[in-house]
Each structure stands twice: as C-alpha cells, then as structure tokens.
C-alpha cells in the first residue's frame, strides 16, 4: 500500500470532518472546545459499548438457548 495515498486519504478525512463540523470557520478556542466535546462523546460511547455489549450478548445467548431447548448456559 502506498503511504502517500494513505496520507492523502487521512488528510481528506480530516478535511471532511472540518467541513461537516464547520471547524474551518471557527476560532481556535472554539475548535478546541468542539473537539473536546466530540472526543468526550466518542470516548463515552466506546466505553459504554465495551462494558455493556458483552453483558447483553450473554443475556441474549441465555435467552435464546432456553427457547431452543439447550439447558447449558455460559458458566460465570
């Protein structure tokens, strides 16, 4: 894979981010505030998914295994 193309792709993604969030027309302190808020939201979503998705998968597995007639469940 060509590293120049990868660099150009990330530059394009960053440009798209600036256009979508209107960061291109903001002052630097406004950009940093918006970036902090977005980073906080993304971090919270990733953490919540990391914590709660395995629990829901286990509960769904137990629910459907009881419906299908399997008596064994995942041991804790």
From Swiss-Prot:
What does the induction field say?
Answer: While expression is androgen independent in the hpg mouse prostate, it appears to be androgen-dependent in the kidney and brain of normal intact mouse suggesting tissue specific regulation by androgens.
Give the transmembrane ranges. Answer: 12-29, 37-57
**One protein family per Pfam:** SPT_ssu-like
In the UniProt record, what gene is named as encoding this protein?
Sptssb
Which biological process terms from the Gene Ontology are attached to this UniProt entry? Answer: ceramide biosynthetic process; endoplasmic reticulum organization; sphingolipid biosynthetic process; sphingosine biosynthetic process
| Keyword set includes Transmembrane helix | yes
Q: What is this protein called?
A: Serine palmitoyltransferase small subunit B
The compartments listed are: Endoplasmic reticulum membrane
């Amino acid at each position: 894979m060509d590293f120049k193309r990868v660099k150009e792709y990330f530059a394009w993604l960053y440009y798209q981010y600036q256009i979508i969030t209107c960061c291109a027309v903001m002052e630097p302190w406004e950009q940093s505030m918006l970036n902090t808020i977005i980073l906080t939201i993304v971090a919270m979503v990733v953490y919540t998914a990391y914590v709660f998705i395995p629990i829901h998968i286990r509960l769904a597995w137990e629910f459907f295994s009881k419906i299908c007639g399997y008596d064994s469940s995942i041991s804790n």
